[in-house]
């Protein structure tokens, strides 16, 4: 189980993937082109990262006509990101008070 957790954290340790997940969470469902634009990432790079996230079960997709819409598949992932960000905000605030 710890190896699987380490693999999940490895996937989440890449800033581009976190940006994509953040944009997916904000948009609910979104086509890859729009996601790439919102995240400021190239289309091929976005597709590569989405494929990795989808294989890990973190991102899902569905087809609507000729469009494929992507979404966050595991609701725990945005919560995990928020926990880490809140921890960092507290840490930075404490460091600022010490300065």
Residue ranges with predicted function:
Residues 1-4, 26, 74-99:
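Amphipathic alpha-helical dimerization/coiled-coil segments
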Residues 21, 50-51:
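Short, hydrophobic-biased segments on the C-terminal half of alpha helices
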Residues 3-44, 64-76:
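N-terminal helix-turn-helix DNA-binding core of bacterial DNA-binding proteins
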Residues 34-35, 43, 49, 92-95:
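Juxtamembrane helix-loop transition sites at the ends of transmembrane segments
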Residues 37, 48, 54-55:
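Alpha-helical residues within the helix-turn-helix
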Residues 20, 57-59:
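A short linear hydrophobic-aromatic micro-motif
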């Amino acid at each position: 189980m710890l190896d699987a957790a380490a693999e999940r954290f490895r996937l989440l340790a890449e800033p581009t993937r976190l940006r994509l997940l953040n944009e997916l969470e904000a948009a609910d469902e979104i086509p890859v082109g729009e996601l790439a634009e919102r995240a400021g990432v190239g289309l091929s790079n976005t597709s590569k990262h989405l494929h990795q996230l989808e294989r890990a079960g973190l991102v899902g997709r569905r087809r609507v006509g000729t469009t494929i819409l992507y979404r966050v598949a595991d609701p725990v992932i945005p919560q995990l990101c928020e926990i880490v960000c809140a921890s960092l905000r507290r840490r930075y605030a404490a460091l600022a008070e010490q300065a």
